[in-house]
Amino acid sequence: MDKNSEEYISKKRAINLWDSGEIDDFEIGSVKGLLDIHYALFHDLDGFDAGKIRKVNISKGNFRFANSMYLGPALEAIEQMPEDDFDQIIDKYVEMNVAHPFIEGNGRATRIWLDLILKKNLGKCIDWQIVDKVDYLEFMKISPVRSKYIKMLLKEALTDKIDDREVFTKGLDQSYIYEGLDEYKAEDIDSQVDK
């Protein structure tokens, strides 16, 4: 087990955030909260510029994320979006995905951010382990113009098991699978002596 790999280190940090209860200390639904989550997961890792808003333009495939020149105002507007019901929360999540405020690690940090918003406002979270990778990535890709599909997919995966560690750790594994990272399972990291 390569304990120096980005996947191992950041997954272990996420597990430690859960186990220590620090995951509940982040400012929920805010840009600051997302920056803090990103920093907690990825600080000291190459290529992340952890916890800092990107200053360069980025794209994935044919999709260009928000222009870095307008990222500040865009993030302020996203932060002000309402979070009163499921649809509003997912709309906010979709907009944050379009903004893609970081150079790397957006998806993993933002999925934790989303779950914290859902937990606070609805007493629910997403059981990510049952959200199919292909469907999720495809529906996120079209979500800026047609969010109903990602809403349907995520609504089917809602659970009230917000304090269930296994839902969190298996969801963490799935979150990394979406990013093509599946060398380490959370349960294997968890069993390591050097906690």
Language-model region placement:
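FIC/Doc superfamily catalytic core
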Residues: 1-195
